[in-house]
């Protein structure tokens, strides 16, 4: 009887250890694919709820409006630099590639990339809004002073 209990205990412990290892490896694999959404103000001052700041090297998506007069193109390459802003702040974005047709100053965009410095994002992808009347909800909420805590 005791030998049977010991065998069952070892089997249960082995199954639990295997399950724990599987969950750990799955969470580790998924964490490298998560891109959190930030606004320029949240990159500078932290998330409104938690005050958590993104760290250098973190993959993220940043949404805001292209600041008028900030677009700089290198005529020899596909390098582009511009600034994104919201009601609370401004961040620099650099991108190498062809921009979407709807990309222009004053329009809402989402840049997906890596935070290289305190206020600089190196984007791998830039998405422009697709319609004159559409603004992504995250960007719309970031631009309203009552949502951001900014004073009018």
Curated annotation (Swiss-Prot):
Annotated SUPFAM superfamilies: Heme chaperone CcmE
General function of this protein:
Heme chaperone required for the biogenesis of c-type cytochromes. Transiently binds heme delivered by CcmC and transfers the heme to apo-cytochromes in a process facilitated by CcmF and CcmH.
Family, according to the entry, reads as follows: Belongs to the CcmE/CycJ family.
Which Pfam families does UniProt cross-reference here?
A: CcmE
UniProt-annotated binding residues for heme: 130, 134
GO molecular function annotations of the record: heme binding; metal ion binding
Chief localization: membrane
Q: Which HAMAP family match?
A: CcmE
Protein name according to UniProt? Cytochrome c-type biogenesis protein CcmE
Name the segments for region: Disordered. 133-152
Q: Signal peptide location in the record?
A: none
What residue ranges lie in the Cytoplasmic compartment?
1-8
TM region positions: 9-29
Question: Does the record carry NADP as a key word?
Answer: no
């Amino acid at each position: 009887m005791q030998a049977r209990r010991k065998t069952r205990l070892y089997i249960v412990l082995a199954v639990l250890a295997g399950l724990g290892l599987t969950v750990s490896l799955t969470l580790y694999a998924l964490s490298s694919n998560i891109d959190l959404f930030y606004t320029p103000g949240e990159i500078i001052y932290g998330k409104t709820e938690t005050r958590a700041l993104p760290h250098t090297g973190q993959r993220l998506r940043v949404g805001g409006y292209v600041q008028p007069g900030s677009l700089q193109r290198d005529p020899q390459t596909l390098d582009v630099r511009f600034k994104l802003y919201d009601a609370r702040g401004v961040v620099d974005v650099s991108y190498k590639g062809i921009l979407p047709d709807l990309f222009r100053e004053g329009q809402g965009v989402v840049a997906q990339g890596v935070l290289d410095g305190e206020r600089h994002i190196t984007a791998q992808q830039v998405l422009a809004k697709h319609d004159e009347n559409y603004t992504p909800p995250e960007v719309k909420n970031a631009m309203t002073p009552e949502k951001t805590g900014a004073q009018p």
